Amino acid sequence: KHVGLNVASDPLGTLTYLGVRGSLVVYSADDPSMFSSQNEQDNRQYARLFGLPCFEPATAQEMKDMTVAAFALSAQMGMPVMVRATTRVAHSRGVVELGDIRPKAGPRHYEKDYAFVPLPGNAVRHHKRLVERMRSLVPVSDASPFNRVEGPADTRLGVVASSAAVNYVLDAVKECGLSDTVGVFRLGMAWPLPENALLEFLRGKDTVLVLEELEPLVEEALRAMAQKNGLTLTILGKGTSDLSTLYEYTPA
């Protein structure tokens, strides 16, 4: 649960420096509208703060697929990976194709390694390594099948959406007969952002609406990205007061 990760945040902030052997996936479910929680914090902020790759599923199938991808990425990069859901996605139902069930790995022998002791001498090297790893993940995010455009990409109006908002906007575009005039960038690997793929989507747009649960993390990054690359377009969202940072999105 999102507030539970607050309790684990002290060791998590060190663990991203140390790295892991094998795989470690942190599954965190946020609670927009506080249906059973004391706050509605956005735990994607931990991904940005500590340096965690972060997946954001929008459907039951993506919950499974992204979890598998997260374990694989964790093993490949030697670092913990986050899967961030929200109440609406966590409570969803759907037909899920499981794919191959892998055999269990055999027993492993524990090896004491002082490189995993979080002392300053190690931390100095580990921080540099973490920064390099996160930079190397940008092209991975660019190539991720979870980051893709639904509908035409060369429209003047676009939407960037993640989590449950993906489902709402795709339904709205279809029901309003806008499938040929609105392109939707479906953001599944939310951190680090797929910078090149997003820039390609932004180019040629007059207006882009950003839909994300809770804080405008993606929206702010898109504005910085557009300014850095000399793109002149209007980016609408929570930072422009067109949407609220309060509560969850609904189909209405």
Predicted regions span which residues?
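Flexible, low-complexity linker and terminal segments
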Residues: 57-252
